[in-house]
C-alpha cells in the first residue's frame, strides 16, 4: 500500500484554490503541467511510500503520539510559489502558515518515529496544485506565462480554517491520476 499522512483542507479553501487554478490554467494552458484534482488537495505531513498493511497500527500509534497535547489550530492558505525555484519550476504550490508551528512539530515527530533515516530536510508546509512533466516543452514560455499569472495571484488569501485532525491516506495510482482514500483519522 502506498501511504502518506496528511492534513486535509477545508471545503471553502479547496474551492478558492480550484478557482485560482482555473485562472492559472487559462493563463498558462500548457500540457506540460499536470494539475492536481481539487479533491486531492492536502498538506503532506509525511510520505511513507509502499508499506505493508500490517504496519498500519504502528503508524496510527505514531500519529497519536506525535499529536498528543496539540489542540486544534488555525491554518491560513495564502500565496503561490514553486519548488525548487522559478528558473526550474517543477511543483506549483499554495503557501500554508499556521499558529504555533504545530504542523512542523507533528511532521518532525512522525519522521523521527516512522522513517529509518530521517531526511533532515526542513518541513515546508504547502498544498501542491500542479507538477511539471519532465522534460518541459517550451520551458521559457511556460515559465514566463506561469510566473506572470502566479504573481497576479501571489498575494491572494485562499482562506483559513481550524485543523481538527490528521489522516492516514492511501494513494492508488491510476492512468487518470492518483486516487486518495482516508484509512484512519486522528483527532487533535
Q: PLM features: residue spans?
A:
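Histidine-dependent nucleotide/RNA phosphoesterase domain, centered on the 2H-phosphoesterase fold
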Residues: 1-188
Amino acid at each position: 500500500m502506498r501511504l502518506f499522512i496528511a492534513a486535509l483542507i477545508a471545503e471553502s479553501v479547496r474551492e478558492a484554490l480550484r478557482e485560482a487554478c482555473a485562472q492559472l490554467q487559462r493563463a498558462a494552458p500548457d500540457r506540460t503541467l499536470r494539475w492536481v484534482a481539487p479533491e486531492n488537495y492536502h498538506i503532506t505531513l509525511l510520505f511513507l511510500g509502499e508499506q505493508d498493511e500490517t504496519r498500519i497500527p504502528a503508524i496510527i500509534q505514531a500519529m497519536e503520539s506525535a499529536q498528543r497535547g496539540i489542540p486544534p489550530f488555525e491554518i491560513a492558505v495564502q500565496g503561490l510559489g514553486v519548488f525548487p525555484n522559478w528558473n526550474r519550476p517543477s511543483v506549483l504550490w499554495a503557501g500554508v502558515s499556521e499558529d504555533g508551528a504545530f504542523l512542523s512539530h507533528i511532521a518532525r515527530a512522525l519522521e523521527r518515529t516512522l522513517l529509518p533515516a530521517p531526511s533532515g530536510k526542513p518541513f515546508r508546509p504547502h498544498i501542491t496544485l500542479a507538477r511539471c512533466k519532465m522534460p518541459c516543452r517550451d520551458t521559457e514560455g511556460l515559465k514566463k506565462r506561469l510566473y506572470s499569472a502566479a504573481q497576479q495571484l501571489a498575494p491572494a488569501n485562499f482562506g483559513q480554517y481550524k485543523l481538527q485532525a490528521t489522516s492516514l491516506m492511501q494513494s492508488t495510482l491510476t492512468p487518470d491520476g492518483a486516487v486518495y482514500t482516508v484509512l484512519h483519522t486522528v483527532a487533535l
